[in-house]
Amino acid sequence: MKFKIFGLFLLLSILNSCGDNIPPVELSPETKILYLGNGTEPKDLDPHTVTGVPESKILMALIEGLVIRHPEGLDPLPGIAKRWDISGDGKTYIFHLRDASWSNGDTVTAGDFVYAWNRMLMPSLGSQYPDMLYDVLNAEAFNKGKISDFSLVGVKALDAKTLEVKLKNPAPYFLELLAHYTTRP
């Protein structure tokens, strides 16, 4: 019995001595590093083409959309849009953007969302989730190649801080759709 206890003590001592004596890395406050336990490496980080959970976790942490999901449910909360107005018929949404910037310091504008949605709906891109925007006027027709002029799609930057979205029919769930990472610029 004494031999077993001694052997166990010896084994634990050897395992304890295997640790590195490397001090923790000191980071300055201005260092911006995202550490994320992701399970696997992402295949891509294009919000309009990825479909995997590892990629979506990173995109949700890096890019904010017009709205975000409440952490305890699906209710939409303001994201880049500090507020929005919905017309009486439920078919027009006006998003008022807050001050936000890209990682390089450029200002996030309503035009960034127009560009992103145009790109997401382009048939040649092969986005897996273009139907997230099919409630937008003419979005489905553009994505399926029935129309080629994106200006006919119901999304328009009224100015740098105001985005207008026109729907083909009222869609009470539309804000929840906008929380999905594929609708982000």
Briefly describe each language-model feature range.
Residues 25-35:
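Immediate post-signal peptide segment of exported/extracytoplasmic ligand-binding proteins
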Residues 112-114, 121, 125-185:
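Surface-exposed binding/hinge segments that line
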Residues 14-17:
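C-terminal motif of bacterial Sec signal peptides marking the signal peptidase cleavage site
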Residues 19-21:
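Bacterial signal peptide processing site
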Residues 43, 60, 64, 82, ...:
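Solvent-exposed, polar/charged alpha-helical surfaces in well-ordered, non-transmembrane soluble domains
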Residues 83-132, 164:
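Aromatic- and charge-enriched surface segment that lines or borders ligand/interaction sites
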Residues 37-88:
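N-terminal lobe/hinge region of extracytoplasmic solute-binding protein
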